[in-house]
Every structure is written in C-alpha cells, then in structure tokens.
Amino acid sequence: MSSAAAATRFIKCVTVGDGAVGKTCMLICYTCNKFPTDYIPTVFDNFSANVSVDGSVVNLGLWDTAGQEDYSRLRPLSYRGADVFILSFSLISRASYENVQKKWMPELRRFAPGVPVVLVGTKLDLREDRAYLADHPASSIITTEQGEELRKLIGAVAYIECSSKTQRNIKAVFDTAIKVVLQPPRHKDVTRKKLQSSSNRPVRRYFCGSACFA
C-alpha cells in the first residue's frame, strides 16, 4: 500500500484532553510503535496513516491538540470536519478526570456537536504501579467503574483504558475510533462490548505524512 491516494475514505480523528495526560505519547506509540521518553508540550501536530479495514483502505488523519488554557482559542480550529474525538484523561489524575465533564465535553458540544467521542483513560501502567503511587501521594487513581460511569454520563460511545509505555490497548483505542465512524452505533446507548467485538477484525496500518514508518 503506497499512499493516501489509495484510500477510499478519509477519517479525521482528533485527540483532546488536559495537558500531560499522554495524548501525544498515545499517538506516537500507535504510529511509531515506540514510547517517547521526553515530554514536550504539544501546540498542534498531525499524523496520517493508511488503514486497511475489512478489505478497504481509509486514510486516518490523527490530529494532536494542546490541552493548556493558552491555546483555548486556537484549539477549536482543529475540530472542524472531525469525524470522531478521542477524549483522554489520566487514570492517576482526578483533575483531568473531572475536566472531561467540566471543560472538554462543553467545548466539544459547542464547536463540534454530534461528533462521536471515545473516552480513554491513559497511564494504566502507573495506576497498577504500587511503588509509583507510594512515591507520588498526590496521585488520585480512577477506577474502571468510575471511567464507565463517566462514559455514560457524557454519552461517549466507548471507554478504553490504555498504557502508552506498555502499549496495552493502544491499538484498540484507534481501532474503536475507526469502527465508530465506519459502522455508527444504531443506538446512542451502545455497549462497549459490542464496539470491542467489532474492533477485533483485522486492521492494518501504513503510515505516511509526519508519522513514523513502521
């Protein structure tokens, strides 16, 4: 598979969420299969990947946005034309969890009403790391049950927990986002189980643009 020109459809997927929750790490792990060791705050960036789904190829445009307040006026410019949002929070940060409902959903509803949202809890490895939690007493873990409750509260189509460091469920995050666009849920209250079952079909990736070639 050579280029985006071979794709039969373009899907714009935008990642949003508080700064430092791991949005960029998640994108880099998905496109490059590696975990970045240095933290560099994102302003705006994008990646492109040709993805083979059920025998047809779609061009997946991945848009990374900055969560800092300094970019609140510019960030919505990235929302135009979005097909799906990946809304992320850290599983060891209650503030980022609470901001999903207080900050991010109101912003998405204002600038991109009706666009489906996949809710993602990041840094799963740290939530399970007792040594890390002992060294960082200010951390406040979010349970899977709390994540599911938030998904229902905001009307997200799916909830997935992942770790960029271990790459656990990273592929599932983007597979689910793709399937949500290609196979929209018939009912708003679709279960995560149904989406994950659909996401189990083979998905192949061919990276281009500013993404790493894997």
Swiss-Prot record:
| CDD domains with a match to the protein in the record | Rop_like
Question: What compartments host this protein?
Answer: Cytoplasm; Membrane
Q: Which domain of life is it from?
A: Eukaryota
UniProt binding sites for GTP = 17-25, 42, 64-68, 122-125, 164-165
RNA-binding among the record's keywords?
no
After translation, the protein is modified as follows: May be palmitoylated.
BP GO terms, sorted: actin filament organization; cortical cytoskeleton organization; defense response; establishment or maintenance of cell polarity; regulation of actin cytoskeleton organization; regulation of cell shape; signal transduction; small GTPase-mediated signal transduction
Keyword check for Amino-acid biosynthesis: no
Q: Which UniProt keywords apply?
A: Apoptosis, Cytoplasm, GTP-binding, Lipoprotein, Membrane, Nucleotide-binding, Palmitate, Plant defense
Q: Do you know which InterPro entries this protein is assigned to? A: P-loop_NTPase, Small_GTP-bd, Small_GTPase, Small_GTPase_Rho
Which N-terminal stretch is annotated as signal sequence? none
| GO CC term, one of those recorded | cytoplasmic vesicle
Q: What is the topology of this protein in the membrane according to its UniProt annotation?
A: Peripheral membrane protein
- The listed location of motif Effector region is 39-47
What's a single GO MF annotation on this record? GTPase activity
Please give the function described in this protein's UniProt entry: Small GTPase playing a general role in disease resistance signaling pathway. Acts downstream of heterotrimeric G protein alpha subunit. Regulates cell death and reactive oxygen species production, probably through NADPH oxidase. Also involved in sphingolipid elicitor (SE)-dependent defense signaling. Activates phytoalexin production and alters defense-related genes. Down-regulates metallothionein 2b, a reactive oxygen scavenger. May control lignin synthesis through regulation of both NADPH oxidase and CCR1 activities during defense responses.
Could you say which protein family the record assigns here? Belongs to the small GTPase superfamily. Rho family.
The record describes its quaternary structure and partners as: May interact with MPK1/MAPK6. Binds to RBOHB, preferentially in the GTP-bound form. Interacts with CCR1 in a GTP-dependent manner.
NCBIfam families annotated for this entry?
small_GTP
Give the protein's recorded name.
Rac-like GTP-binding protein 1
Q: Which organism is it from?
A: Oryza sativa subsp. japonica (Rice)
Its taxonomic path starts at: Eukaryota, Viridiplantae, Streptophyta, Embryophyta, Tracheophyta
